[in-house]
Amino acid sequence: MVFFSCNNCGEACKKNQVERHLFQCRNTTFSCIDCQLVYTRETYKDHVKCITENQKYGGKNYVEKENKGEAKQNAWVDQVNRAIEFVTDSQVKELLKSVAGFANIPRKEAKFINFLTNSCRLRDKNLALRAWQAIAAEADKMREEAIRKQEETQKMEKAQKEAAAAAKKETTVATTAAEVTDAPESTFKWKKVIKRKLKENGGEMKIKKLKKAIIEELSAAGAASDDVDSIFDEKLQKCAAVTVDGKKVSLVV
């Protein structure tokens, strides 16, 4: 419960006593006893909750933990405020505006109607019931919105997981394919094949013909490569068992 002090006479008032006190001190303002902020007759209703002693004396880094009951009450106040915003019945709208100024608005229908009768001096039970129905309608809407948002979040998370799994699978497949392609080339016996091809052709061949024969061997071994030309030239230069003379290559006798 929020307590105020009248800045005209100094009398302390509970929040639900401020309206009555305004008949005594008409043009006054009120200071919150806890936070010392000043409120007018129009703004005091918005001051629903004030700082606790722990917040007041706990230092600048203190963070107040919201208990479950308080969380439920705050959610209920949100429903009341939404009802005020969207209700089209002017009587209900004005009634809910006056209700919104109270700290602990009952969350059960029977208690809510009794609260309107006792605290708001409302004698029209039909109006009280319409006010309850307006809040209940917003509660249903908020519940549906929460379910829809949760479903959208779950769909998004599922899509992200599936995309990540697909990307991982694609990377794995590409890596495996690269390993399969690269493995035969890394184990391909270049020097032995070069010497064998030369022996099969009388110890001498044109470089172009030898390269073609080597590429056929590579393809048969499943080791096709985009840079086979440069690899062939490098392997040929390093092969001590052959000599290169212009466009021909011969075995060293």
Swiss-Prot record:
PROSITE patterns: ZF_C2HC_LYAR. A zinc finger (C2HC LYAR-type) spans 1-26, 27-51. GO terms for biological process: negative regulation of transcription by RNA polymerase II; rRNA processing. It is found in: Nucleus. Pfam families: zf-LYAR. Zn(2+) 1 binds at C6, C9, H21, C25. The keyword Membrane does not apply. Keywords: Coiled coil, Metal-binding, Nucleus, Repeat, Zinc, Zinc-finger. Residues 136-171 form a coiled coil. GO terms for molecular function: DNA binding; zinc ion binding. GO terms for cellular component: nucleolus. Zn(2+) 2 binds at C32, C35, H47, C50. It comes from the Eukaryota. The keyword Repeat applies. Its main location: nucleus. This is Uncharacterized protein C16C10.8. It comes from Caenorhabditis elegans. The lineage of its organism: Eukaryota, Metazoa, Ecdysozoa, Nematoda, Chromadorea.
